[in-house]
Amino acid sequence: EVKLLESGGGLVQPGGSLKLSCAASGFDFSGYWMSWVRQAPGKGLEWIGEINPDSSTINYTPFLKDKFIISRDNAKNTLFLQMSKVRSEDTALYFCARNWDVGFDYWGQVTTLTVSS
């Protein structure tokens, strides 16, 4: 059974940093592209970026690439999202997802980031 379990969310002050994790199990993690996606309150899903199996290619949505860093540890079957200089508009539900074809076939259970002073 494929499972993706996010962690690391919480309350962060504006300008702060946070690292989210996504622990994968039930499949060969090292063989798949993986993505991060978020959903702000009252908004639709927003793709953050993706990373290929050996971390040699990482793609970001343009306006987030300077503040978010995606990485992975295949030995630990874990995907990461390092966020810096967070602002109130970064408040959202954050999901990891396994890429498949032109979309995603499995999603994580979600972790929540709230940016507030």
From Swiss-Prot:
Question: What Gene Ontology molecular function terms does this protein carry?
Answer: antigen binding
**GO BP term, example:** immunoglobulin mediated immune response
SUPFAM superfamilies tied to this protein: Immunoglobulin
* Aminoacyl-tRNA synthetase recorded as keyword: no
Instruction: Report the Pfam families cross-referenced here.
Output: V-set (PF07686)
Instruction: Please give the GO cellular component terms listed in this UniProt entry.
Output: extracellular region; immunoglobulin complex
Concerning CDD domains, the annotation shows:
IgV_H
Report keywords, A-Z.
Answer: Adaptive immunity, Immunity, Immunoglobulin
Q: Where is the Ig-like domain?
A: 1-116
What positions belong to coiled-coil segments? none
- Gene3D superfamilies linked to this entry: Immunoglobulins
Any further remark recorded for this protein: This chain was isolated from an Ig gamma-2a myeloma protein binding 2,6-levan.
The molecule here is called Ig heavy chain V region UPC10
Native species: Mus musculus (Mouse)
Give the source lineage, highest ranks first.
Eukaryota, Metazoa, Chordata, Craniata, Vertebrata
